[in-house]
Design a protein with these regions (language model features):
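Fold-independent oxyanion-binding glycine-rich loops
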Residues: 16-18, 59-62, 69, 100, ...
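Flexible gly/pro-rich beta->alpha loop and the following alpha-helix that scaffold active-site loops
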Residues: 1-57, 63-76, 81
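Amide-donor transfer/coupling interface in amidating biosynthetic enzymes
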Residues: 2-9, 42-49, 78-136
Length: 136
């Protein structure tokens, strides 16, 4: 109940990166997904996002958690199915650290509000499980 109360007072919920479960693939993401599927917590998060104009941010394993929960790409916490989008190991089977080029197509985010629409930005990316897989 203390966690639900904390969410009800928050403006943003942030899922941090980091490793747990002996660095098992998606270890932290699995933990976050399990905790946030609790009905009271789920309801509190959805009220934050839908009724209070709250924000969600996920870094590293935290972004994996957003995908596992369904917040990305669906905008709501949903149960995973066999066809659910996921992040998985890179095709080369190891960590990748490189610059990627990203086109900003919307600035409907406080993190992108000063970005120039349709401009391409070079940004750093570093991950071992960064391959996004989704069915059509």
């Amino acid at each position: 109940d203390a966690f639900v109360k904390a969410i009800s007072l928050a403006q943003i919920i942030m899922f941090p990166g980091g490793f747990s479960a002996g660095d098992e693939p998606e270890g932290s993401a699995k933990f976050f997904a399990t905790v946030f599927r609790n009905e009271k917590i789920k309801e509190s998060v959805m009220k934050l996002l839908n009724e209070r104009d709250g924000l969600a941010l996920g870094i590293c394993n935290g972004f994996q958690a957003l995908v596992k929960l369904g917040l990305v790409p669906y905008g709501e916490i949903v149960n995973q199915t066999e066809d659910s989008p996921t992040l998985t190991m890179n095709e080369i089977g190891r960590h990748v650290s490189t610059m990627v080029y990203t086109k900003v197509v919307t600035n409907k985010s406080p993190w992108l509000r000063k970005a120039v629409l349709d401009q391409i930005y070079a940004i750093p990316a570093s991950h071992g499980e960064g391959r996004f897989v989704a069915s059509k």
